[in-house]
Amino acid sequence: MKRVKGAFDERAAALDGLLGVGRSFDMIGRTLRIGGRRARLWVVNGYADDTVLERAISAWLPIPSLEDVGTLQAFADRYVSVCDAAVETDRLKAVTAVFAGKTLLVIDGFSGGVVLDAKQFPLRSVEEPDTSKVLRGSHDGFGESVMKNAALLRRRIRDSQLTLESLQVGTRSRTDVVLCYMENRVDRKLLDQLRKKLEAMDVGSIAMSQESVAEAIAPPQWWNPFPKTRYTERPDVAAASVLEGDILLMIDNTPAVMLLPCSLFRFLEEVNDYYFPPLVGTYLRIVRVIVLFLTLFVTPLWYLLVKSPDTLHESLHFLLIEDEYYVPLILQLLLVEFIIDVLKLASLNTPDVLSNSFSMLGALILGDFAVQARWLVPEVLVYMAFVAIANYAQHSYEMGYAVKLCRMALLLLIWLFDWWGFIGGILGTLALIASTRPLIGKGYLYPFIPFNGKDLWALLHHRPIDRNNS
């Protein structure tokens, strides 16, 4: 093959410039001599598996000549032993592959380059998610590598119908995004709809991973606090969802996997329901539904009844406040709502060695000291303590804050308009839920609207596996 003088130097210099060799300390560009020809290899230091690269280079250096090798593909077939290796002629794709952790090899006299997958990301070990623990079942969890997450899913679903479709999102970050679904179970219309939304994303980066993707493809409803997607860090939950026909959205650099489509009733499900007998699982689900309603209505209803003591029946007089207080009740309730969030934020930044002391200090400030100073009455602390604990009975952090904002709005409406405010707040909450538009799917209130009795019954109770295992 005839080689153009200076062509290799120009290609190498251009790739050095695009990859930042000499500008970024972690970008390595090494010149080799393979079969009597000049070659250059690019790799990001910290990504590469040194053992794999050393083995590959040791096999290339003794090659006496490449005169009998007609194409770069023939070279890759004969001398490249790495399993995941391909010839790439598109310069931009080759550069992107290097930034993603792969190794690029360019040889004088051949067009394009060989892209080798010899990467080894710095990863934490597989461990159970802190926010989704189970008494029984597997104790592993997704990590920050989409390849590792795909392997955890493949381990549970050994079926040729399982499809993992790779996309890249972000003009600068070029983050790997994987659509995961079962070919014979997925709704093709919803799949095409989601794929088009991802391909139409025009963003520079998705540094915040799944939240950035959700915001980019979600309908514009910034004023609506209800979550439009579910997340999980558990491979067993992801596997069960995809087998039911759901679509998983895996995003590199985050352990959270998006479960689509999403509806309000899907938040009633929790992994522990399926690791207990059907009757126990159904009971736990019913408890979760009741607690969700109590979380929304306990403090507004109590405040409404206490605000109008003349209309209170004698059997409910125990709800009235007998102690003297200086701060209005509405301010007490909103103040405790605010302080609970402050404690949550502070606990995230508190070192483990100080967490016990921090908990004791927070309990004293919110408890005995506040009551003695007559800032708060004991009844407010009791009801707000129940609300704070009950908020964790359902697993979605986003749904918890949606309920919290609706509860605070109810309190303000009751303060302004009494019973009419309570009725208006309930109607407004229902209207807000009904107007929520999910990323994809039949509707946020499905299977209630549009009604599907079979699916609704399946969501409200734990159905045992039948003899057909379906």
Describe the predicted segments one by one.
Residues P378-V380, M384-S470:
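Hydrophobic alpha-helical transmembrane segments of membrane transport and translocation systems
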Residues M1-L301, L305-E314, F318-L320, I433-S470:
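Membrane-embedded alpha-helical signal segments
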Residues R158, E199, K344, V371, ...:
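Short polybasic/polar patches that bind polyanions
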Residues L249, A256, C262-L410:
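Transmembrane alpha-helical segments that form the functional core of multipass membrane systems
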